């Protein structure tokens, strides 16, 4: 997963870059928070098989508070997805491997 800066995010969002190509998955996290550390292990295990189907990003809320603010992130871990058509969905909490795979497959199949 690639770290996402404010500049990169604004380019993707404003120019629509990647929105018609692949859906976007953003993991908002804090390095010091236990649930984020646990979810990171799940992400590291599951997401490599999706790199060709989904644009995968992570955002450290302490380093990029403006991106977190745009999505009104109040707690972490928090996952935000943007479908190919531009629909935004947010989910709070860590997922297990099975649920994450189900979630990612649903994101891929959404038009």
Segment roles from a protein language model:
Residues 1-4, 109-111:
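N-terminal targeting signals for export/organelle localization
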Residues 3-4, 28, 40-43, 47, ...:
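Thiol-based oxidoreductase modules, predominantly thioredoxin-like and allied folds used
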Residues 3-23:
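A short beta-strand-turn-helix
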Residues 7-10, 65-66, 98:
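Acidic phosphotransfer microenvironment of two-component signaling modules
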Residues 21-22, 28-32, 75:
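Short pre-active-site segment immediately N-terminal to redox-active cysteine/selenocysteine motifs
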Residues 32-39:
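Short, thiol/selenol-centered motifs that function as redox-active sites or metal-ligating centers
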Residues 65-74:
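Mid-chain, well-packed structural core segment of small domains
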Residues 75, 80-111:
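Non-catalytic, surface beta->alpha helical segment in thiol-disulfide oxidoreductase systems
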């Amino acid at each position: 997963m690639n770290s996402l800066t404010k500049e990169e995010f604004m380019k993707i969002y404003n120019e629509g870059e990647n929105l018609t190509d692949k859906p976007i998955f953003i993991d908002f996290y804090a390095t010091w928070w236990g649930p984020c550390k646990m979810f990171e292990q799940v992400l590291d295990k599951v997401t490599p098989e999706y790199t060709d189907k989904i644009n995968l990003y992570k955002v450290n809320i302490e380093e990029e508070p403006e991106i977190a603010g745009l999505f009104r992130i109040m707690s972490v871990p928090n996952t935000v997805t943007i479908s190919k058509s531009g629909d935004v969905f947010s989910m709070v909490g860590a997922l297990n491997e099975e649920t994450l795979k189900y979630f990612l497959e649903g994101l891929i199949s959404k038009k």
